[in-house]
Amino acid sequence: MLKQIVSAASLVLALTASSVGFAQTAPDELVRKNTGDILTAIKADKDLAAGDQKKIEKLAEEKVLPYFNFMHMTQLAVGRNWKDASDDQKKALIEQFRTLLVRTYSTSLSQFRNQTVDVKPLKLSATDTDVIVKTIIAQPGGQPIPIDYSMEKLPEGWKVFDVLIDGVSLVTNYRSSFNTEIKANGIDGLVKSLSDRNAKNSAKK
């Protein structure tokens, strides 16, 4: 289930990215305006289309990840254990979780070709500081996938802090496995587990 959630989330989160800052564009309009940019880039570059992991990872780093609030995502994924973590542990958790998502999203991006995204209109007021943008991914030969993603308004603009695929939260799914690891081996154990997983993924390149 988690793999399916991450794969589906990758498309929507990728399609939100552009050189236009979140502060200048409403969240739903940002998604609507830039739908297809990443898919176009993949189709136009034979290396990307062939699944070149390094190039796809670079694409994700440049076009997608600047628009995530990784600190908030990590805090939500770690849950109640976050308050028990030291500053150094929090920094390590954010770094390792970010690396995990970078590589997971990069792998998933290489699988997208002909999907389309329908972005539902959002009623946004001037005082809103967090919103949920609802979208539907249509995939040839497959069932449409409803995706809601939570965004918050920060001084630097709108950023993503959670994604719900067919009602299931990406952050909540990670929280379950993170809590299991922390119960068994503590926060340092979770950091090591994430670090080991990232090292293993890196070795597969």
Where does each model-flagged region fall?
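Sec/Tat signal peptide C-region and signal peptidase I cleavage site
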Residues: S19-A23
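Bacterial N-terminal signal peptides that target proteins for export
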Residues: M1-A9
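Bacterial N-terminal signal peptides
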Residues: A8-S18
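Short beta-strand edge/turn micro-motifs at domain boundaries
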Residues: P144-T172
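Low-complexity, intrinsically disordered terminal/linker segments enriched in charged
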Residues: D162-K205
